[in-house]
A protein has these predicted regions:
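N-terminal glycine-rich phosphate-binding loop for ADP-containing cofactors
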Residues: 1-293
Length: 293
């Protein structure tokens, strides 16, 4: 209802991630909004400069990206992406409102691919996956390490891939490969993995497909969770991995271990921390913003 747009102080666009559809919406908003109202997009992938390309100067300075993380009710992080053309006073007002009224942890990001959260998050996921292949870590072992011990959902890395969709993650990687400069270390962990390509081609795209790195099968009439062998591509009954920490897992003790679990954890953390430092000042001028994200 564009009559409501005419009265609103802040309009948030959250339509499908297609630039043609978004531009069409912005054209309609531009003819109905009141001057000085704030307009923002909830995009997680499209650069601000592209989104605002057809806007008037007045609308452009009041337009930004407000990237809410899902589920919005429970995830505190909010990335506000700005450009040089933005009205800084308006951005600060929006940040204050989202902090005080919406209870969000607001981070101001530069207009770069993936912003902060997804740029580092996807890199970390790719590191965890590629290191598992390289170090011959099973997917159950990888998920036990790159899961709760590192503040990741209990799905772990491979379970998270299945949840998101292996094919969707492949599209995300293609987007990063296209947008990021060739010297960016992201490219080192974004190369095509034959097993992943085969899973997608055969319909094993994750939970929404026939299965993925994990799948449900039946044995003697009972459902059995199976895990894929990264070397052979064959499935076997999933094994429960005990890291030997009990209820409380100390990440410092984990990375100091001399076994394969400790080496795997240390390898991931080292690469992710180095990459995060590499991104300053490209994604943000403040190290604390990366820590907060």
């Amino acid at each position: 209802d564009f009559n409501e747009v005419a009265e609103a102080d802040w309009v948030v666009e959250a339509v499908v991630e297609r630039i043609d559809i978004k531009h069409n919406i912005y054209n309609k908003i531009q003819t109905t909004r009141k001057n000085n109202s704030i307009i923002s997009s909830n995009t997680s992938t499209i650069p601000l400069k592209i989104l605002s390309a057809n806007m008037s100067d007045e609308m452009k300075k009041n337009f930004c990206i407000t990237h809410f993380f899902n589920p919005v009710r429970y995830m505190a992080l909010l990335e506000i992406v700005t450009e040089e053309f933005n009205d800084i006073e308006k951005i600060n007002l929006l940040k204050q409102f989202c902090d005080e009224k919406l209870g969000k942890g607001v981070i101001i990001c530069n207009d770069t691919p993936g912003f902060i959260g997804n740029r580092i998050g996807v890199y970390a996921m790719q590191v965890a996956m590629t290191e598992a292949f390289k170090m011959k870590i099973s997917i159950e072992e990888a998920d036990a390490v790159f899961g709760r011990p590192m503040g990741i959902p209990k799905t772990g890395i491979f379970g998270l891939y299945d949840l998101i969709g292996i094919d969707l993650m492949a599209d995300v990687l293609k987007s990063f490969i296209k947008e990021l400069p060739k010297e960016d270390p992201f490219h080192e962990v974004a190369q095509e993995i034959p097993l992943v390509t085969k899973l997608i081609e055969t319909g094993y795209t994750g939970r929404k497909g026939k299965g993925g790195f994990y799948r449900m099968n039946k044995s003697d009439g009972k459902k059995v969770l199976e895990a894929i062998n990264l070397e052979t591509g064959e499935y076997h009954p999933s094994q429960k991995i005990n890291l030997g920490f009990g209820d409380k897992i100390d990440i410092n003790k984990l990375i100091q271990r001399k076994d394969k679990y400790g080496e795997y954890a240390k390898s991931i953390l080292t690469k992710v921390i180095r990459y995060a430092a590499y991104l300053i000042p490209d994604v943000s001028s403040k190290y604390i913003d990366i820590d907060d994200a």
